[in-house]
Structure formats: C-alpha cells, structure tokens
Regions:
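Active-site rim/loop-helix segments in enzyme catalytic domains that contact anionic ligands
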Residues: 1-100
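Active-site adenylate/phosphate-handling loop in enzymes that bind or generate adenylated species
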Residues: 96-129
C-alpha cells in the first residue's frame, strides 16, 4: 500500500495484522465512506501466528486495506510475542504518529488476555504526546 502525503483523520493501531479489522473495521469502513482519511499501523507482522504465514497475513492486510478504503497502512516491524510498553518500542511507534499527524488515534481495548494486545494499547496511548 502506498503511504499518504497528508495528515489522517484516524490512525488505528493494532498489535497484529487483522486486530484493527476485528476491533473496529466497521467503524473505519463507515468513516472512510464518509470521506475521512484513515490509516492503520500494525505493530508486528504476526510472525508467530498459527493462522497463516507473515506473507499470507501481509496479503490479507493489503486486501483489507483496499476494502476499507485506507489511505495508508504501515507496519512497525516490532517482534510478535514481544510487544512491551518500553521507551525503545515507543520510539519505534512515535515516528509513525508524527508522520500521520492523526486527529484521532484508536488502539486496542484493555484489559485483554493477549499480552501483545494489551501492550499495543499502552504503546499507542503513550506514544501520543
């Protein structure tokens, strides 16, 4: 997916490809249909998943981006199974937020039984300063 040149209305941050779609895909589709500029930041490639290889998940995420009408979708390349709200990982997320300049940031809900989902929530929240 090509990246954008302007700020976005909404940046949705998920731990793995498909997290954002499962959590708020309907909302993003609605906002996109209303002309809002929407972007997704996947923090990992989902490389530890038992539901497809990283390449398959990437292809699925590109297909989902087209369906949702996203203006951009990026991947931070952080380790699947190793997300943590550390200064180092926040520093990996901050450049995306600065580049997208979103009006609204959506993250995963907390509490969550998956530690990467919980960490994604706090990383997204704390990287917005």
């Amino acid at each position: 997916m090509t990246t954008h040149q302007e700020s976005v209305d909404v940046l949705a941050i998920g731990a793995h490809p498909d997290d954002v779609e499962l959590g708020c895909g309907g909302l993003l589709a609605k906002l996109s249909s209303e002309g809002k500029r929407i972007a997704i930041l996947d923090l990992t490639r989902g490389e530890l998943s038992t539901r497809g290889t990283p390449n398959e998940r990437h292809a699925e995420s590109e297909h989902a981006a087209a369906i949702l009408g996203l203006c951009a979708r990026e991947n931070a390349g952080l380790p699947d199974g190793g997300l943590s709200n550390t200064p180092e990982q926040r520093l990996a997320v901050i450049p995306f937020i600065r580049r997208f300049r979103p009006k609204v940031v959506l993250t995963l809900m907390t509490p969550d039984r998956h530690p990467d989902h919980e960490a994604a929530h706090y990383l997204g929240r704390d990287a917005c300063f």
